[in-house]
Amino acid sequence: MSDSETIRQVLENTKIIALVGASPKPHRASYQVMQYLMHQGYDVYPVNPLKAGDTILGRSVVSTLDEVPVAIDMVDVFRNSVDAGDVVDDAIRVGAKSVWLQLGVINEPAEERAIEAGLAIVMDHCPAIEIPKLGIAPVA
């Protein structure tokens, strides 16, 4: 499910992103990707139960996907492969349209559950790499 056409469709049909595993530390990949996505015009909601109530890049951090105040287009997962399964299940439960597992994050049983539930899923890729590679225009 992580072919270029699927990646393009997910990115072009996404405006609202819940970024699970968001970090306030500028040297962390989750911070850098969140910053990049925001600069591309995506509306990004940081999710991290250990940082709930804090702010990252001017956005209030929530502890769970349930606390994101709008419908979620994509859940971007910065968790390890084992923990990603629970996040995929949460994404299914809250009605997200797609799930994106970052570089190095692969969970095939979770991928199957997402597909069965009708979600698009991308594994082992980074949107901050794929957007310029595919020439995806900023969100209007």
Tell where the protein language model's regions lie, with residue ranges.
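Short N-terminal or domain-adjacent regulatory/targeting segments
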Residues: 1-14
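A short helix->loop->beta-strand "cap" motif at the edges of active sites that frequently abuts
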Residues: 40-42, 94-99, 117-119
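Short loop/helix-cap segments at secondary-structure boundaries that form the rim of catalytic
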Residues: 51-58, 70, 111-113
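Conserved SAM-binding strand-loop segment of SAM-dependent methyltransferases
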Residues: 59-64
